[in-house]
């Protein structure tokens, strides 16, 4: 039964994907994923990224957010991207392939960051979905907790954090933890986020720890 559900869900996703306005627009603009529009919308509302900034992009593949970020930081800025999956090169983006939960990958990422702290941490990470909330939600919350931990390691005072979170068990506790670490936290649901998705984005500014 679960296999049939996943097949039906996969078929629905495929139909939505190929008939999706944002997918078509991404292809037209040469963007690697529709997710790029989510960061563009967050940027329009919250002005997270400015020229000259250093940005860390977690869960970067296939590169939609990195494409947007590297244009925003300009020639004097820096984008450091990391993903367990491979990603085709993007000019101006320093990409590290690996699982940053592993010590050697984390060390390599911190080496790329260097002595200076970063201005923005981005995370559009999501687990491979099984279709079971009891499995998927804990996995998703684990990833966002890792992203917040990365902020504690690399983010400069008054830095910013944008993270995709799935509403469900653990969300309220996570929101509390983010509010403890940042002066201002806003919840955003970009127009380019599918309406039926439980995903929202927390935009946190004014890092204070």
Swiss-Prot record:
Record keywords, A-Z: Cytoplasm, Methyltransferase, rRNA processing, S-adenosyl-L-methionine, Transferase
Binding residues annotated for S-adenosyl-L-methionine, in chain numbering: 63, 65, 83, 99, 124
Record SUPFAM superfamilies: S-adenosyl-L-methionine-dependent methyltransferases
Protein name: Ribosomal RNA large subunit methyltransferase E
Active-site residue numbers: 164 (proton acceptor)
Compartment(s) where it occurs, according to its Swiss-Prot or TrEMBL record: Cytoplasm
Function: Specifically methylates the uridine in position 2552 of 23S rRNA at the 2'-O position of the ribose in the fully assembled 50S ribosomal subunit.
Gene Ontology CC terms, in alphabetical order: cytoplasm
Class of enzymatic activity (EC top level): transferase
HAMAP family the record matches: RNA_methyltr_E
Annotated GO biological process: RNA methylation
Pfam families linked: FtsJ
EC number: 2.1.1.166
Positions in coiled-coil regions: none
Catalysed reaction equations from the record: uridine(2552) in 23S rRNA + S-adenosyl-L-methionine = 2'-O-methyluridine(2552) in 23S rRNA + S-adenosyl-L-homocysteine + H(+)
GO molecular function: rRNA (uridine-2'-O-)-methyltransferase activity
Family that this chain belongs to: Belongs to the class I-like SAM-binding methyltransferase superfamily. RNA methyltransferase RlmE family.
